[in-house]
């Protein structure tokens, strides 16, 4: 039986556009995410 294709096709530009820093800073909720990750001491804040 044939399975479908793999669903994760890595693409750095799309990754940044969907989960990137500029996108997070656009909305109040996104800024809250970044500040929470800063507070927690995350090595990486966004994709």
Swiss-Prot record:
Task: Give the record's family classification.
Answer: Belongs to the bacterial ribosomal protein bL34 family.
Here the disulfide bonds are: none
- Record-level GO cellular component terms: ribonucleoprotein complex; ribosome
Q: Name one GO biological process term.
A: translation
Q: Spell out the Pfam families in the cross-references.
A: Ribosomal_L34
State the protein's name: Large ribosomal subunit protein bL34
Provide a Gene Ontology MF annotation, just one.
structural constituent of ribosome
Q: Which parts of the chain are coiled coil?
A: none
> PANTHER family attached here?
LARGE RIBOSOMAL SUBUNIT PROTEIN BL34M (PTHR14503:SF4), MITOCHONDRIAL RIBOSOMAL PROTEIN 34 FAMILY MEMBER (PTHR14503)
| Key words of the record | Ribonucleoprotein, Ribosomal protein
- What is the protein's species of origin? Rhodococcus opacus (strain B4)
Please give the superkingdom of this protein's source. Answer: Bacteria
Keyword check for Kinase, yes or no: no
């Amino acid at each position: 039986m044939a399975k479908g294709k793999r669903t994760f096709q890595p693409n750095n530009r799309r990754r940044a556009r969907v989960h990137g820093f500029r996108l997070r800073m656009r909305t109040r909720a996104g800024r809250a995410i970044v500040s929470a990750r800063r507070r927690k001491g995350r090595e990486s804040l966004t994709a």
